[in-house]
């Protein structure tokens, strides 16, 4: 471990390589924002003796609930769907709340990304053990694995493997973006609606990503911290696409090089998928725990069209999965009217990008909504701290 969590909603960081620390400071992340970082000169590939690197499947877990959560916390496990919320926090159910169901998110609805799909196909047995461990940590009797119908091989594979787990059920889901959003997934699987401003635990659910269940298995059964993850490297501009098991800290440029290098007509590098991903300003930035994919877009497809005036068509309202009014939030955000933004529930926005995608006026709706949401979050934190 090279960096310890400094609060409850925080996660430990482990070195993914053996070597010598050469610098402690700040480096630009993928978006160009300077972040705390530790630089290590790689020296060989030595592992701690307590880490079980064998491929043997360890199904039995005799740890108590508290021991499971402690091991997950020590391993630095976070949500690997992109939000990177510490997993041990999700497993620590607040007083007065009760977890009834665990839902494993195997939807992966973001276009181009297939990392979770490969994990389900190639590490399905380990995933199921991880799911069972998470169920025990939560004290729930039922776990569901939600997978969209466009992954029939994963559905069939996990159904066969889960025959020995009567409390785990694979649920095929309609192909619909953004089906992988927590609240959308809960409604699709359980038929329960998370209230505005609420959390999944408010309706008795805890959601974990498919990749997270694998990381939990490795942490609890193999004593392995979160030092690597599967990343989709893709895009029509690339000569070689793949899902790669990547050490945390690997430069994004190394993944692009593996894919054949940067084509001349590349217009944009995206960290994530085309809907919710963000443009990469620094290709030398490291892969992080939340890096699900690196997407290269050709120049022709990456140029934004000139925004026009809103024509009040309400298409953005019609496609919003949260029932919000994106055009209204866009206007408030542009005018820095944060009280109004809070009043129209901007914090409920899941940043799926449907509004921007469908806007006939090419307005940068999501860009301004993200800015407004960030400012409202600051106001709410300040208010809570008083």
Predicted regions and their residues:
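Generic structural motif
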Residues: 8, 14-23
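Ferredoxin-type iron-sulfur electron-transfer modules in oxidoreductases and energy-metabolism complexes
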Residues: 291-307, 317, 321-386
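Short hydrophobic beta/alpha edge segments that flank linear recognition/processing sites
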Residues: 1-8, 25, 36-41
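Conserved mixed alpha/beta catalytic, RNA-binding, or beta-rich assembly cores of soluble enzyme
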Residues: 72-84, 95-127, 189, 219-309, ...
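Hydrophobic alpha-helical hairpins/lids featuring a short glycine-rich hinge
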Residues: 32, 38-104
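Hydrophobic beta-strand signal
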Residues: 1-3, 22-23, 253, 270, ...
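Short, conserved beta-turn/loop elements at beta-strand boundaries and strand-helix junctions
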Residues: 23-29, 262
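Hydrophobic alpha-helical positions that pack around
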Residues: 140-252, 258-263, 273
């Amino acid at each position: 471990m090279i960096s310890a969590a400094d609060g409850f909603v925080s996660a430990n960081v482990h070195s993914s390589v053996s070597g010598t620390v050469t610098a402690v400071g700040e480096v630009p992340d993928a978006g160009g924002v300077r972040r705390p970082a530790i630089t290590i000169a790689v020296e060989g590939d030595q592992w701690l003796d307590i880490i079980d690197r064998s491929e043997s499947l360890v199904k039995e877990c005799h740890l108590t609930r508290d021991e499971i959560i402690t091991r997950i916390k020590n391993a630095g496990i976070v949500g690997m769907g992109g939000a990177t919320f510490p997993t041990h926090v999700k497993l620590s159910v607040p007083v007065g709340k009760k977890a009834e169901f665990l839902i494993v998110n195997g939807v992966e609805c973001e276009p181009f990304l297939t990392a979770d799909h490969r994990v389900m196909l190639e590490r399905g047995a380990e995933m199921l053990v991880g799911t069972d461990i998470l169920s025990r940590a939560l004290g729930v009797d039922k776990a569901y694995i939600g997978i969209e119908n466009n992954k029939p091989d994963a559905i069939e594979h996990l159904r066969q493997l889960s025959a020995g787990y009567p409390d785990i059920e694979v649920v095929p889901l309609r192909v619909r973006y953004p089906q992988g959003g927590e609240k959308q997934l809960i409604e699709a699987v359980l038929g329960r609606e998370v209230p505005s401003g609420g959390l999944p635990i408010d309706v008795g659910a805890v959601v974990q990503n498919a990749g997270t269940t694998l990381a939990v298995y490795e942490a609890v059964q193999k004593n392995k911290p979160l030092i690597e993850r599967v990343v989709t490297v893709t895009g029509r501009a690339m000569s070689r696409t793949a899902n790669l098991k990547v050490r945390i800290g690997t430069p994004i440029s190394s993944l692009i090089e593996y894919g054949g290098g940067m084509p001349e007509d590349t217009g944009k590098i995206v960290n994530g998928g085309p809907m919710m991903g963000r443009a990469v300003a620094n290709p030398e930035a490291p892969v992080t725990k939340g890096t699900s994919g690196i997407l290269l877009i050709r120049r022709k497809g990456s140029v934004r069209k000139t925004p026009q005036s809103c024509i009040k068509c309400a298409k953005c309202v019609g496609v919003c999965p949260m029932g919000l009014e994106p055009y209204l939030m866009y206007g408030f955000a542009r005018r820095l009217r944060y009280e109004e933004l809070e009043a129209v529930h901007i914090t409920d926005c899941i940043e799926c990008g449907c509004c921007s995608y469908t806007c006939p006026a090419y307005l940068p709706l999501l860009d301004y909504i993200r800015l407004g949401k960030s400012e409202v979050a600051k106001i709410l934190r300040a208010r809570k701290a008083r």
